[in-house]
Amino acid sequence: MIRNFREHVDEIVVTDDCSGDGTATLARELGATVHSRPFRGYGDALRQGMEAASGDILVLVEADATFRAKDLGKLLEYLKDADMVIGTRTTRQMIEQGANMEGWLRWGNVAVAKLIEALWWGSEPRFTDVGCTYRAIWRDAYVKIRDYLTRDDAAFSPEMMIEMLRVEGRVIELPVRSYRRRRGVFKYSASRCKSLWTGFRILGVILRKRLNLS
């Protein structure tokens, strides 16, 4: 991932959960800034990474080569007219064989995304994916919502979307290529049972946000 992105960005921050597989050492050798500490989960790692980054534009990706820099240009182009641009992995023709976006998972993301559309209809959102990490956001926009980002798990991604809508930010969704993971497993969707449990937790977050309970 670092090799793929380093020619396209000014800085790469890797959040490393004190892993013992040499991730931090390799990342530093490739020129990344490594932020090592025990994280409480996926959302906490992303949040700490954004806090550690210094740029005016923050780009989030996973470290397992699921996404490529070839899609970064269009995210940044659309960001000129938005507060945040998020990717969607639901375009079938852009999903590599073996990628973790089986039909049931893809349609589950679509269904939950449409629920957010319905509940925040006045903001005119157009979403088809609530779980795509690949996104770009202006630092100023992130600062507006960071105090409301409380989730440490996979619900962090839809929470970002919802909080941008709540501050009347403009969010644009674009299709991005989704590739097979080169290593590791995303624990929140490692099996159908875990995906369903993650989905229910995300639904709970959405409803609490809509009812202003969090």
What are these regions (language model features)?
Residues 1-7:
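Short, well-formed alpha-helical segments that are part of the catalytic scaffolds
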Residues 61-63:
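Catalytic metal- and UDP-sugar-binding loop of GT-A-like glycosyltransferases, i.e.
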Residues 23, 70-72, 160:
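Acidic donor-diphosphate engagement hotspot in glycosyltransferases and nucleotidyltransferases
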Residues 58:
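Short aromatic/hydrophobic "clamp" motif used to bind/position activated sugar donors
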Residues 16-24, 65:
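A conserved acidic beta->alpha catalytic loop
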